[in-house]
């Protein structure tokens, strides 16, 4: 995308030349899946997991390219924005007013060996947009006026924290099952004190909501 910051991070890494595709008078540069399979590196870094490949590609979506790489024994580090998760598509549309067309199936995320949340406060992300560190200037201005408004970013950040917390909970449940661990230590999560030793009144009225907020706070901090 012509970002100087990204170019600097790539220094010293082997870059696989893109596959050039001509489509409707436009030159597109796509990930060369066959070249990657031929080289068989131990690890590939690939951005934008939800990307739609150019017409004529072997797979319509980049996440399908990743699955083929994994099947061939090649490890992949990739990135995906929370708004591209299929399970959140309807919620994202309701909050932002934008229906995201490029999505990644939930199963792809669930099959990942590890998921790391890259958390950035909305104000910091907005500044990066203004500085041209996310999109080129023309694209950045359009993004700031539409999808990437501060209210939307706050909501998307919360969704990312919640989705990551859910994954941590699932991992904990598997660990408990495999190691026959009981749930007695969950009491610390189920009881939220207000500082005077009394549980928060709203949490008492809505215990399930209180527990969810506690899990979000507990696990959210753990993955930042």
Regions found by a protein language model. Name each.
Residues 1-38:
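Conserved P-loop
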């Amino acid at each position: 995308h012509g970002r100087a910051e990204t170019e600097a991070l790539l220094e010293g890494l082997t870059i696989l030349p893109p596959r050039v595709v001509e489509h409707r008078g436009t030159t597109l540069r796509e990930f060369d899946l066959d070249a990657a399979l031929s080289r068989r590196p131990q690890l590939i870094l690939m951005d934008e997991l939800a990307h739609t490949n150019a017409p004529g590609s072997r797979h319509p979506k980049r996440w399908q390219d990743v699955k083929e790489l994994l099947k061939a024994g090649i490890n992949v580090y990739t990135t995906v924005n929370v708004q591209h998760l299929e399970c959140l598509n309807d919620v994202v549309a309701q909050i932002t007013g934008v229906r995201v067309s490029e999505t990644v199936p939930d199963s792809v995320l669930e099959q990942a060996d590890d998921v790391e949340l890259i958390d950035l406060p909305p104000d910091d992300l907005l500044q990066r947009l203004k500085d041209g560190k996310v999109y080129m200037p023309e694209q950045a201005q359009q993004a700031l006026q539409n999808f990437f408004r501060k209210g939307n970013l706050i909501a998307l950040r919360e969704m990312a924290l919640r989705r990551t917390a859910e994954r941590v909970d699932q991992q904990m449940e598997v660990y408990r099952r495999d190691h026959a661990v009981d749930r007695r230590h969950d009491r610390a999560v189920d009881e939220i004190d207000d500082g005077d030793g009394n549980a928060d009144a709203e949490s008492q009225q809505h215990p399930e909501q209180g527990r969810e907020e506690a899990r979000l706070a507990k696990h959210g901090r753990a993955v930042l």
